């Protein structure tokens, strides 16, 4: 079964050379309405042929093209007969592989720059931020490079320059090969979206087929084709990903879906009641409510290592699903909310340079002998795309745009060993923090906010007595892409109010601190 529109028919291939911004390129292309995939640079020619892209983008990267062992694009990229767009490192390796030269620079260019367009091409057609005195177009861009192209291939022309970068953009119009030394995918490059859009839609000739309505239609058709008349079991947490999966499956197979809501003791305050009310009472899904707090906490007893805790929680979920599936006669499929960044992070490059940043319980840690097949309808989607189709499916905005919550829940927000006492205290403290953020109209002004339980006691004075009670840390960050983040400068009066409420209303907590660490060097979550 297929949809009336093949939404994968026109597509862009992005080869990843390791830039922290590479996923942004893919997200920008999806926002334009075109499907794309992100692969490691060391892909085989046969795989590119099979994918048959309308165009290829070579990403930036941290290494130097001048190094003997530095990554190179497969030569077939330049023989495939499709447009190629090199970004930063991608432009440098393209230039060198096609006969140009790259050299290290005595002056590293990092930050804002103004690029002067010196040669009219289809690549920058009608795209500029300002006009120079000589009539040339000017672009405000974001640079991040040390090396630079010092000689271009003989069949290329110089398109743009800066005072310190003689080849800020290059082009071979006949072959539709283009390169820029700046990063169009970041918001700091003001016309970046238009540059990418022009390449994808006009130069590569792609259509805007990748829309929320088409994605939903395609996902439903694929689910029906994959599972047939079998029953499917889904772990419903109430988070964005599992909620959207539940709605897609419900539309596709109706009552053949059984959602298992596992109350593992690691959820937010009143989350269980909210999930059952929304999906059971309002949307009419078939939900099995499993109360497994003791099971999870017993499995976590004595464990302090964050990665080990993630694996324990993941295995416990799978065990519960296996048990529940045995009660369903035809349950042969386990649905999961795996999304595209999970897949990217968990995929190791063939050359061994890639590594798993954090294990995702949706992708890693699954037992080899798991008895069910996997259904992952969101596997191709970024989080912003998941939210958009969630709205299209009728889920409420405030649920879809809630701050991120880790899959292992409070299991990684209670530092060290996880105990029921710690979780109960953390739940109440966190609820106060989030409630006050909403009351002060600050919730949507920060990207993520939560409370962390610290397993240390601190002296406090309550009434006439001294007592030793626990410490919690408030964490709030501002970020565009969650790759880097700044700590949120919340008002002192606000922080004081939250601290007073937590200490006065949550018996067992004597001290509240505020985390002012950025990412990097710290990560957003503590574990």
From Swiss-Prot:
The active site is at 88 (nucleophile), 183, 185. Coiled coil: none annotated. One of its GO terms (cellular component) is cytosol. Pathway: Purine metabolism; GMP biosynthesis; GMP from XMP (L-Gln route): step 1/1. SUPFAM superfamilies: Adenine nucleotide alpha hydrolases-like (SSF52402), Class I glutamine amidotransferase-like (SSF52317), GMP synthetase C-terminal dimerisation domain (SSF54810). ATP binds at residues 237-243. InterPro entries: Class_I_gatase-like, GATASE, GMP_synth_C, GMP_synth_GATase, GMP_synthase, GMPS_ATP_PPase_dom, NAD/GMP_synthase, Rossmann-like_a/b/a_fold. Residues 210-402 form the GMPS ATP-PPase domain. Its EC number is 6.3.5.2. Keywords: ATP-binding, Glutamine amidotransferase, GMP biosynthesis, Ligase, Nucleotide-binding, Purine biosynthesis. It catalyses: XMP + L-glutamine + ATP + H2O = GMP + L-glutamate + AMP + diphosphate + 2 H(+). One of its GO terms (molecular function) is GMP synthase activity. Residues 11-209 form the Glutamine amidotransferase type-1 domain. Pfam families: GATase, GMP_synt_C, NAD_synthase. PANTHER family: GMP SYNTHASE [GLUTAMINE-HYDROLYZING], GMP SYNTHASE-RELATED. Homodimer. HAMAP family: GMP_synthase. Catalyzes the synthesis of GMP from XMP. This is GMP synthase [glutamine-hydrolyzing].
């Amino acid at each position: 079964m297929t949809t009336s529109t093949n939404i994968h028919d026109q597509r862009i291939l992005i080869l990843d050379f390791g830039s922290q911004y590479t996923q942004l390129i893919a997200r920008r292309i999806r926002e334009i309405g075109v499907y794309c995939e992100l692969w490691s640079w060391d892909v085989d020619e046969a795989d590119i042929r099979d994918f048959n892209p309308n165009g290829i983008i070579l990403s930036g990267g941290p290494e130097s093209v001048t190094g003997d062992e530095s990554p190179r694009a497969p030569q077939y990229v330049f023989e495939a007969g499709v447009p190629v767009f090199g970004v930063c490192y991608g432009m440098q390796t393209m230039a060198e592989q096609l006969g140009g030269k790259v050299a290290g620079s005595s002056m590293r260019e990092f930050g804002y720059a103004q690029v002067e367009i010196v040669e009219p091409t289809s690549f920058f057609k009608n795209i500029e931020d300002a006009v120079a005195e000589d009539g040339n177009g000017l672009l405000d861009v974001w640079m991040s490079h040390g090396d630079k192209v010092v000689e271009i291939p003989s069949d290329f022309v110089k398109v743009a320059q800066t005072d310190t970068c003689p080849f800020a953009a290059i082009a071979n119009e006949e072959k539709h090969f283009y390169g820029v030394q700046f990063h169009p995918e970041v918001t700091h490059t003001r016309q970046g979206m238009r540059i990418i859009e022009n390449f994808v839609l006009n130069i590569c000739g792609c259509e805007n087929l990748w829309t929320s309505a088409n994605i939903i239609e395609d996902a439903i058709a694929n689910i029906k084709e994959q599972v047939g008349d079998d029953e499917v079991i889904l772990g419903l947490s109430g988070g964005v990903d599992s909620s959207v999966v539940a709605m897609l499956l419900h539309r596709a197979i109706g009552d053949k879906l059984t959602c298992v809501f596992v109350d593992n003791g690691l959820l937010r305050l009143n989350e269980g009641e909210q999930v059952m009310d929304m999906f059971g009472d309002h949307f009419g899904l078939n939900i099995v409510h499993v109360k497994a707090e003791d099971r999870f906490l017993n499995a976590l007893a004595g464990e302090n290592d964050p990665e080990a805790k993630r694996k324990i929680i993941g295995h416990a979920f799978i065990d519960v699903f296996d048990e529940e599936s045995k009660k369903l006669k035809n349950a042969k499929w386990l649905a999961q909310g795996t999304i595209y960044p999970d897949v990217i992070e968990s995929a190791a490059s063939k050359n061994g340079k890639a590594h798993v940043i954090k294990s995702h319980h949706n992708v890693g840690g699954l037992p080899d002998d798991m008895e069910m097949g996997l259904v992952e309808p969101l596997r191709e989607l970024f989080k912003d795309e998941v939210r958009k189709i969630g709205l299209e499916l009728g889920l409420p905005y405030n649920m879809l745009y809630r701050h991120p919550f880790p899959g292992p829940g409070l299991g990684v927000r209670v530092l060290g060993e996880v105990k029921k006492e710690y979780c109960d205290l953390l739940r109440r403290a966190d609820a106060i923090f989030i409630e006050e953020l909403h009351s002060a109209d600050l919730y949507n002004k920060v990207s993520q906010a939560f409370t962390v339980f610290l397993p240390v006691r601190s002296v406090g004075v309550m009434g006439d007595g001294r007592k030793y009670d626990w410490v919690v840390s408030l964490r709030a960050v501002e970020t565009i892409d969650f790759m880097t983040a700044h700590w949120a400068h919340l008002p002192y009066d606000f922080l004081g109010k939250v601290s007073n409420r937590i200490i006065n209303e949550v018996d067992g907590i004597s001290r509240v601190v505020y985390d002012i660490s950025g990412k990097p060097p710290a990560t957003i979550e503590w574990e």
